[in-house]
Amino acid sequence: MIIYRDCISQDEMFSDIYKITEVANGLCLEVEGKMVSRKEGEIDEALIGGNASADGPEDCTEATVITGVDIVMNHHLQETSFTKESYKKYIKDYMKSIKARLEESKPERVKPFMTGAAEQVKHILGNFKNYQFFVGENMNPDGMVGLLDFREDGVTPYMIFFKDGLEMEKC
């Protein structure tokens, strides 16, 4: 399994159990999720390879059911909010941080990143009202903000992450 971490906060943002597509000329990763309902404290068996029928009967106790997007719930992402103006300030500072990291580690990515990022930010601001914003579990204000939107069907959630702001970790 591959875990994708925010390169600034080191928070786990998502893993390769989801359908991942490069978008915006390879600048971003689009991660498709699904809406799920879980009892509070319950672990999704798909994540651990469990089999409920083999584990024996479950205790019947009242439990709180939580419904949400699997990417958000599985990786403990925290919702945050922005106005258009506050997002512009955040993204400007975030782009500077990523540019500095790229200059050190992958100088050949700086120009394509900065050019593509400007276009992507325009697209994000143009569709600003469609997005919900999520940060990693530690809620680092300098870290990556994932954008949650829904497909045209209104049912299928997907998140967008800047690829150059992620580190991959094999588990």
Swiss-Prot record:
The compartments listed are:
Secreted
Recorded hits in InterPro entries, A to Z, give: Mss4-like_sf (IPR011057), Mss4/transl-control_tumour (IPR011323), TCTP (IPR034737), Translation_control_tumour_CS (IPR018103), Translational_control_tumour_p (IPR018105)
Tell me, what is one Gene Ontology molecular-function annotation carried by this entry?
calcium ion binding
Q: Which UniProt keywords apply?
A: Secreted
Q: A cellular component term (GO) from this record?
A: extracellular region
**Entry-linked PROSITE patterns:** TCTP_2, TCTP_3
Q: Which residues form the TCTP domain?
A: 1-171
Q: In which tissues is it expressed?
A: Expressed by the venom gland.
Task: Give the principal location in a single coarse category.
Answer: secreted
Keyword Secreted in record: yes
Provide an example Pfam family for this protein. TCTP
Q: Does the keyword Secreted apply?
A: yes
Q: Which SUPFAM superfamilies match?
A: Mss4-like
Give the record's family classification: Belongs to the TCTP family.
Job description of the protein: Venom protein that causes edema, enhances vascular permeability and is likely related to the inflammatory activity of the venom.
Additional comment: Secretion of this protein from cells may proceed via an ER/Golgi-independent pathway, probably mediated by secreted vesicles called exosomes.
Q: What is this protein called?
A: Translationally-controlled tumor protein homolog
Organism encoding this protein: Micrurus fulvius
Taxonomic classification = Eukaryota, Metazoa, Chordata, Craniata, Vertebrata
